[in-house]
Amino acid sequence: MEIEPNALSLNELQLQYSHKELEQYLKAKTTQLSEKSVLWFNKASTILWDTTQGIISKDTMNAIREYTLSNYKCHDSWGKIFGFVKSFLTHLTRTRMNSNYQSFDVYIEKPRVRKEIKLLTSRILTSDDVKNALISLESSNLPREKKQNFKTTLLFLAYTGQRVITVSRLTVKQVKDALTKTPNVLTVEANQDKIRLQHYVPLHPVLIPLLKDLTEGKQDGDLVFCYNEFMRWLFQNPVQLTNIDGKLQLKDLRKFFEQKSDEIGFNDANKNFIMSHGVSSINWTSYKQFLPENVYKRYIDCWGSVDINNSNSPN
């Protein structure tokens, strides 16, 4: 007598999927994602196929778990790989109309890790760190155009607190539009933001002439900042941080904006909105509303006197 699949325990059950199904799912999953996210999805997909060869069973799921825990020590890495596998099992459950696929995710749970709660970040950034990077740029042998692009990128990140990935997607048209408005407020579109939040970014007066120079003569669809080249330059020409043993990275400038904002009293909802940070609660999505002129006024009230570009500035 033939045993119905649902009558089998997971210990005995074996299911199949094709490499084509996995490729199609991966392609759909990685559409319009950042390079870093795509890299992790590709890595997880490779691990899944190499370990299972199209067979879903208790043994292959355990093999994925053991391989991942042995080769990756970071709790976040486990989550990314296991999360992809679980989502693919859910996909197979829906497309093949067989709930047994999803049942196998019980074998790929992350081990419980007790995390220490850090009350303070150990990475402290100050205006001196940004100034030192500016000095390093000014004394470099870079061509003028490249030097100006890197300098403007550095100051834009420091004065706005935007994510590097967001800044990398900004177009000449967006910046030109912001420069013609009163007040000068740039709109980041939802598809440019990590958490898909359309938000306003006030442009500090220090940035205005730099952005005008950077966008002059360029096409509307061009990207504004050469962030990849700047990241490579910083790697090859490291800038030592003043308060900790470490080198400046572009992502540090978001921390600088956060820490400097706390120092000068810019620590309300406007700051979080500008940074697109901590804004996913129901209170935010349902009740908060921001007008560009109000966001700009509050920002300038606090940040207006901060002149990082001036080596003699007390700020």
What is each model feature region?
Residues 204-246, 252-257, 262:
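Active-site/catalytic core of tyrosine-dependent DNA strand-transfer enzymes
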Residues 155, 159, 252-278:
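C-terminal catalytic core of tyrosine-transesterase DNA break-rejoin enzymes
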Residues 22-120, 136-142:
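N-terminal core-binding DNA-recognition domain of tyrosine recombinases/integrases
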Residues 160, 169-210:
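Conserved tyrosine-mediated DNA breakage-rejoining catalytic core shared by Y-recombinases
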Residues 90-98, 157-182, 268-270:
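Short, charged phosphate-coordinating catalytic segments
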Residues 79, 113, 119, 127-164, ...:
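Basic, Lys/Arg- and aromatic-enriched nucleic-acid-binding interface segment
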Residues 192, 275-310:
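Catalytic-site neighborhood detector that most strongly recognizes the C-terminal catalytic loop/helix
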Residues 114-135, 193-205, 219-225:
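DNA breakage-rejoining catalytic core of tyrosine-based enzymes
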